[in-house]
A protein has these predicted regions:
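Class I SAM-dependent transferase core
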Residues: 25-63
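Conserved Class I SAM-dependent methyltransferase catalytic core
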Residues: 45, 49, 170-226
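Conserved SAM-binding loop
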Residues: 104-105
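SAM/dcSAM-binding transferase cores
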Residues: 225-275
Length: 275
């Protein structure tokens, strides 16, 4: 069994948190998100947070007082972005890599966001989640950005961490959705992002235990196929599936879409976030 390590970040412990062991400074960058409202330290190479994490956060239907669990949080980008938009959530960041988890812990403290950081493999099993305080029916909202690149079409990176963060196995999505179903309360909310050409995999994974799906396709522009899908699902939901109008990252002229820019700057949310 994989032993989980959990630590709670107090927003007042910035100096102590900053002194914790991290990768060498030369290997780390500090980047601004949400128009500078969120500052994140992350590895210069390997898996780096970007637009996917912020779009996922903007699609997450969290409310003040909710227990929100970010599975595979990396350095905390998506979960911390949710906490910046929705004050008063009880945030848990779950990450398998100890170095990324430590960066997530420090990022939470540096941004004065209270968060619990758990070092745990999402596919570790129910007992490990119980040990980490993530028992069945204990979360109101789960968000996830699982590894989603198809290994048959994606050249594996020599960087093991990068490969694990980006390349899915045949069971990755189903396993992560199973975890979300177990830890969510009845009528709990799941938000996820996946590659658009894998929509059939998403629908199959959500077929058991989830309903009331809302799907938002993300396109580079109006002339291109969707590159991502953002999906919201409800544990035990029974409402019909809704397909939203496409989210265009760029106008036909190549100019960035103003609404998307507002969302990325932390000035708005996506329709899936409303409940």
């Amino acid at each position: 069994m994989i032993k989980a390590f959990s630590s709670e970040v107090d927003p007042g412990s910035r100096e102590e948190s900053a002194s914790k062991k991290q990768p060498a400074a030369a290997e780390i960058t500090e980047d601004g998100f949400l128009g500078g409202q969120l500052r994140l330290r992350q590895p210069k190479s390997g898996h780096r947070a970007g637009h996917d994490a912020i779009l996922l956060a903007a699609a997450t239907p969290a409310r003040s007082g909710d227990r929100v669990v970010d599975l595979g949080s990396g350095v905390g980008a998506a979960g911390l972005a949710v906490a910046r938009r929705v004050r008063g959530i009880d945030l848990v960041l779950v990450e398998i890599d100890p170095d990324l988890a430590e960066l997530a812990r420090n990022n939470a403290a540096a941004n004065a966001i209270k968060a619990e950081v758990v070092i745990l493999d999402v596919e570790a099993g129910a007992a490990a989640f119980d040990d980490a305080g993530l028992a069945p029916d204990s979360a109101d909202v789960v968000l996830m950005n699982p590894p989603f690149n198809d290994p048959s079409r994606h050249r594996a990176s020599p960087d093991g961490v990068r490969q694990r963060a980006h390349v899915a196995t045949a069971t990755t999505l189903a396993a992560w959705v199973h975890v979300a179903r177990r830890i969510l309360r009845s009528n709990g909310q799941l938000a996820l992002i996946w590659r658009a050409d894998g929509i059939a995999e998403v629908l199959a994974a959500l077929d058991r235990g989830f309903g009331s799906l809302e799907i938002l396709p993300v396109h580079g522009d109006a002339t291109a196929p969707a590159i991502r899908i953002l999906v919201r699902a409800v544990k035990g939901g029974r409402a019909p599936t809704r397909l939203h109008a496409a989210l265009l990252l760029n106008e036909e002229s190549g100019v960035p879409n103003k609404w998307v820019q507002e969302v990325l700057a932390g000035k708005g949310e996506l329709p899936l976030a409303r409940r």
